[in-house]
């Protein structure tokens, strides 16, 4: 009920029905004991009443629109805080329990004080390393992790930063001693807080963080901005200063390019369930079936090619099993940045580490106490190999933690086997300095960092114990280019086309079409875009519009076989067989032996009742393709309706001797009846009824041919009698 009342107030505000919204909010606040909120609302109401009074008196106020926006903004902000305050009293969600416990935090636990503790960590750690047995290490790690945790939770649960909070948060960005991981965690807390409640100061902080020198930090901030705008798409229009800052950030267009990349990464994450399903249902079972082939194949570098050459039969078996294609497809998806590990790691999120929400956001750190506990401070042997794998950009942070905990709990022999499988190359290669530095460089690329962070978020919203307490943006339509504040930033042809093509490749015709139409409206369409728009329309069964698009493509890139073929198909679908035929003939001129084209051209001629010409096409098809039942069927029917009964029967007999369908028995029955072989006709009709699965469907199908039979000279009065013979 609290959410419903709040939503109603917000709807009124969006419709600019400010007076109603304020009176609804007044009633909403009756249940809240928060006097500061009541006072803020009263002030906003009074200001609005004065404003309306001046207007009634005809007083011209050049600042009126600005003031109106400010009152509306203030009303909305009061509504936000009222909603949270009321939910704090009733909700069992983790977020609200955090807010209820905020009072217990000592006052000196502000951002600046926590910053000092975090900044001292690298030095404290260095001192411990000099001590025998790393004395005091546990206490240092614990103090650091608890401080980072308090900063995370207090930031997340603070829905409304004061000017002082904002200043202190800026101090974190400016600090040169703060460990980067702590700043990353703080950036995630700011994003989570914005998801619960819009706060201009936090949004402004993210705009600062996007320009931070460290890639980990600026990429997290970028994803944070995208999330904040997806959660509050229209909100920014009330804050011109924030909109102005966004435009300023994008002066050289680089911000838009980066945000567009995040947009694609978010869309790609929505494909994860499909990939998951493919892994579970196709790839893993296929691997299990082909385990012997896999066992005989050795991937990687061979010292001596003579002794270790592969048995070519294994390669063949591998390819013929279809597994080769599937693995290649997965590799391509992985290179593209798709989340191919979700199904593997989804099972590995039950470790105690993942019970705490903030741990899902902590960048992977070999110096995290939970990792040191399992592997020691300086990993050696297999663990050193593991740490190399963990420096690569193949896994997101959350999966790296899972991997470590899993490795720590399995026997040594299995661990070595798993590691060698995962690297899929000889381990020496990983140890090779040049290769491991290439891996490190890959891991430091902005696109890799942001993509892995999106994978971390995906896991949090899909797998964490408290996932049901959060709005899962991955389940919703993600359309960043439609957010008003991003219109000027993302609605640029070179960016829109990447999103359109992504949807097109992933077979989302409706989404791709909307974007192609936008590109066409921006006068930025070439033949390629009209072709793709046409194809999307065709997929949506909007054939007439598809034809329009294809015709435009044909003007821009004349006589392109693909366009002509699709034009023919669409004309055929709307039963304009004359136009379809015209285009099939154009394709035929370019590809005279294309079997499908011959068949469809013949079919169009048959529909136009030009049977002699149709037969020429079907005979040609029968000549170039041996045992072409499709051609035989067409020849049989065209011969029958054209009065060539012997020829018709000859072809139906060929069909009945190979792989007949119910319709073949039915049509052969027609020919037998027309040539006076009543008994044979009744027998064929009985077989047809059997194949159709009963008299009812048989009679329905027979009824469709009734007119043709009468035209061929069968007496209409005989039809009921024949039906009773069947």
Residue ranges and their predicted role:
Residues 694-726:
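Terminal, low-structured helical/coil segments at or just beyond the last alpha-helical repeat
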Residues 30, 518-521, 551-555, 585-589, ...:
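Conserved structural position within tetratricopeptide repeats
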């Amino acid at each position: 009920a609290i959410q419903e009342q709040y939503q109603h107030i917000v709807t009124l505000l969006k419709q600019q029905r400010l007076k109603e919204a304020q009176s609804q909010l007044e009633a909403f606040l009756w249940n809240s004991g928060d006097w500061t909120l009541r006072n803020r609302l009263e002030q906003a109401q009074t200001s609005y009443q004065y404003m309306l009074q001046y207007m009634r008196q005809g007083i011209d106020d050049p600042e009126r629109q600005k003031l109106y926006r400010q009152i509306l903004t203030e009303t909305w902000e009061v509504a936000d805080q009222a909603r949270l305050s009321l939910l704090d009293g009733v909700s069992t969600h983790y977020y609200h329990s955090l807010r209820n416990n905020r009072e217990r935090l000592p006052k000196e636990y502000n951002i600046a004080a926590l910053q000092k503790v975090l900044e001292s960590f690298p030095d404290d750690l260095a001192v411990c390393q000099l001590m025998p047995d790393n004395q005091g290490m546990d206490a240092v790690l614990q103090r650091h992790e608890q401080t980072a945790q308090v900063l995370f939770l207090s930031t997340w649960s603070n829905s409304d930063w004061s000017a002082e909070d904002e200043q202190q948060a800026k101090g974190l960005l400016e600090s040169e001693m703060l460990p980067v991981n702590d700043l990353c965690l703080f950036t995630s807390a700011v994003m989570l807080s914005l998801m619960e409640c819009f706060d201009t100061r936090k949004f402004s902080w993210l705009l600062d963080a996007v320009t931070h020198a460290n890639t980990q930090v600026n990429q997290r901030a970028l994803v944070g901005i995208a999330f904040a705008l997806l959660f509050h798409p229209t909100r920014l229009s009330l804050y011109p200063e924030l909109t102005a800052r966004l435009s300023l950030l994008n002066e050289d267009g680089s911000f838009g390019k980066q945000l567009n990349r995040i947009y694609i990464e978010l869309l790609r994450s929505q494909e994860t369930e499909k990939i998951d399903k493919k892994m579970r249902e196709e790839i893993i079972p296929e691997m299990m079936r082909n385990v012997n082939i896999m066992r005989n194949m050795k991937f990687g570098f061979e010292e001596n090619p003579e002794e270790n050459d592969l048995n070519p039969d294994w390669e063949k078996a591998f390819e013929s099993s279809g597994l080769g294609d599937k693995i290649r497809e997965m590799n391509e998806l992985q290179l593209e940045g798709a989340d191919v590990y979700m199904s593997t790691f989804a099972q590995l999120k039950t470790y105690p580490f993942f019970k705490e929400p903030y741990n899902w956001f902590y960048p992977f750190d070999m110096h995290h106490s939970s990792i040191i506990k399992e592997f020691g401070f300086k990993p050696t042997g297999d663990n050193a190999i593991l740490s190399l794998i963990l420096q690569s950009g193949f896994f997101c942070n959350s999966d790296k933690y899972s991997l470590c905990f899993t490795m720590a709990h399995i026997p040594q022999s299995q661990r070595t086997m798993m590691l060698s499988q995962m690297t899929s190359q000889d381990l020496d290669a990983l140890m090779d300095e040049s290769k491991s530095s290439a891996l490190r460089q890959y891991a430091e690329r902005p696109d890799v960092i942001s993509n892995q962070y999106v994978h971390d978020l995906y896991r949090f919203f899909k797998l964490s114990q408290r996932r049901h307490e959060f709005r899962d943006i991955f389940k919703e339509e993600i359309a960043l280019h439609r957010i008003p504040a991003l219109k000027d930033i993302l609605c640029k042809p070179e960016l829109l086309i990447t999103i359109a093509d992504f949807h097109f490749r992933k077979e989302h015709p409706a989404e791709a079409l909307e974007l192609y139409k936008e590109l066409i409206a921006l006068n930025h369409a070439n033949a390629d875009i009209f072709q793709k728009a046409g194809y999307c329309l065709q997929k949506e069964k909007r054939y007439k519009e598809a034809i329009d698009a294809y015709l435009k493509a044909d003007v821009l890139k004349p006589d392109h076989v693909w366009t002509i073929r699709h034009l023919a198909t669409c004309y055929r679908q709307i039963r304009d067989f004359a136009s379809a035929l015209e285009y099939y003939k154009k394709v035929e001129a370019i590809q005279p032996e294309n079997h499908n084209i011959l068949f469809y051209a013949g079919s169009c001629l048959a529909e136009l009742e030009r049977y002699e010409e149709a037969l020429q096409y079907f005979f040609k098809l029968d000549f170039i393709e041996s045992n072409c039942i499709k051609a035989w069927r067409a020849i049989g029917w065209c011969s029958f309706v054209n009065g060539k009964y012997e020829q018709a029967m000859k072809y139906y007999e060929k069909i009945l001797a190979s792989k007949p369908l119910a319709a073949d028995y039915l049509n052969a029955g027609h020919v037998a009846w027309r040539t006076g072989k009543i008994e044979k006709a009744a027998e064929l009709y009985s077989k047809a009824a059997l194949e159709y699965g009963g008299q009812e469907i048989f009679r329905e199908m027979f009824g469709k041919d009734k007119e043709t039979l009468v035209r061929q000279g069968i007496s209409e009065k005989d039809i009921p009698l024949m039906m009773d013979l069947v």
